[in-house]
Amino acid sequence: MSIDTIVAIATPPGRGGVGIVRISGPNAYAIALCLNGNKALQPRLATFCSLYKGNNEVLDQGLVLYFKGPHSFTGEDVIEIQAHGSPVVLDLLIKESIAAGARLARPGEFSERAFLNDKIDLIQAEAIADLIQASSDTAARMALKSLQGDFSKKINQLNEELIYLRMYVEAAIDFPEEEIDFLNDGNVSQLLQRIIGRLEEIRSQANQGVLLREGLSLVIAGRPNAGKSTLINNLAGRDVAIVTEIAGTTRDIMREHILLDDIPLHIIDTAGLRDSDDLVEKEGIKRAWQELKRADCVLLVVDINNPDQQNSLHNELKLTLPDKIPIITVYNKIDTTKLTAKCDEHTVYLSAKTGEGLDELKKVIKQVVGYQPTEGQFLARRRHLQALDEAKALLLTGQSQLTNHKAGELLAEDLRLAHQTLCEITGEFTSDDLLGKIFSSFCIGK
């Protein structure tokens, strides 16, 4: 790891009452003395100082805080300067810090140093960015839980159980004279099944966290004049799409973002799906299919007065889209019939015009994507889900090796790989490429 000293503005761009400049590294204290006219600083105490340019001209006045390593966020000596929130003043403080020996920090470099100095693990580092970017109260609370180590503790406990199982299996293989018959005594099978069960439980909780963090891409599809634009307007609570009786009014992709019980919902309204000779409409339909293939969930809107629309288009969607994308059929315009709003697992009857049945639709969406708020929930990322899925696949393979082939060495290797995969979640075993990708997504100053 580099041992140079870094500096960055830690507050958002723009003007404000207070702006913070953060410095971290072996020369942080010396740079602070250059800025404050050699006024001594006590660790963990705020000191009021005048702040100077190199020619002893006063730049500003503010508070300077000194955190002596390793008792700091990064584990290094850290200085935080609380000056007035003028972009000009803060830029001058950065320039003076660089002149005194610091360099400008890369995005996320403060958090990266905290990770490399074992102040936080990789889950906690990601949680810092997630807390900053949280789109709802619940997402912020869940990010804080991850930052406080809730998710990490679950992974570490799982790893401890896996380490114990690995030791038992490998000891039996390496020391056959001890006559440990792990292939037949049932202990390994029970321990392995328990670990798989715990992993599935954590995976389910992590999936809820991914929904809260990343949200859900919900694509509205249907024939022209089925009421798609009216539905997106009602879901959004405002007029975001033009609604007319003319078929083919919507020709391009329309996007709107709302919160559905704290889940960020990225709603995409598409052109009506039909054969058309109009070049502009054909391009809109082409883009609609592209969005459908990327969706997390599809709402197929059907005019209840023309139910035959549903069969052909539903079959076309089923044949074209990946099996993992759920399709909810929405029978619209019940206000023109004697029907009332109702729903079942993948079907909703509603009126986009009056709003009747919208609550039922929201309920079905949450059920279809598997959102179930639970105690102990935490924020997670897709890479965490991928690692958990990979670890489970390895454990299931190992279980098969044990049950069907009595292959102890192959079981031991699958357990080792599963352990390594889980350690990638917390960063115990992580490639430099992954670290670079994660920390580069942070804002500068974190």
Curated annotation (Swiss-Prot):
User: Where does the source fall among the domains of life?
Assistant: Bacteria
Report the CDD domains cross-referenced here. Answer: trmE, TrmE_N
Please state what class of enzyme this protein is: hydrolase
Free-text remark on how the cofactor is bound: Binds 1 potassium ion per subunit.
Under SUPFAM superfamilies, the record lists:
P-loop containing nucleoside triphosphate hydrolases
EC number from the UniProt entry? 3.6.-.-
What are the alphabetically sorted keywords of the record?
A: Cytoplasm, GTP-binding, Hydrolase, Magnesium, Metal-binding, Nucleotide-binding, Potassium, tRNA processing
Annotated residues that bind GTP are located at 225-230, 244-250, 269-272
Q: Where does Mg(2+) bind?
A: S229, T250
Query: Could you tell me where this protein is found in the cell?
Result: Cytoplasm
The SS bond pairs are none
Keyword Ribosomal protein in the entry? The reply is: no
Q: What is its main location?
A: cytoplasm
Q: Which GO terms describe its biological process?
A: tRNA methylation; tRNA wobble uridine modification
Residue ranges of every copy of the TrmE-type G domain listed in the record = 215-370
Q: Where does K(+) bind?
A: N225, T244, I246, T249
Q: Which family is this protein grouped under? A: Belongs to the TRAFAC class TrmE-Era-EngA-EngB-Septin-like GTPase superfamily. TrmE GTPase family.
Role summary: Exhibits a very high intrinsic GTPase hydrolysis rate. Involved in the addition of a carboxymethylaminomethyl (cmnm) group at the wobble position (U34) of certain tRNAs, forming tRNA-cmnm(5)s(2)U34.
Its subunit composition reads: Homodimer. Heterotetramer of two MnmE and two MnmG subunits.
HAMAP family in the cross-refs: GTPase_MnmE
Q: What is this protein called?
A: tRNA modification GTPase MnmE
What species is this protein from?
Answer: Legionella pneumophila (strain Lens)
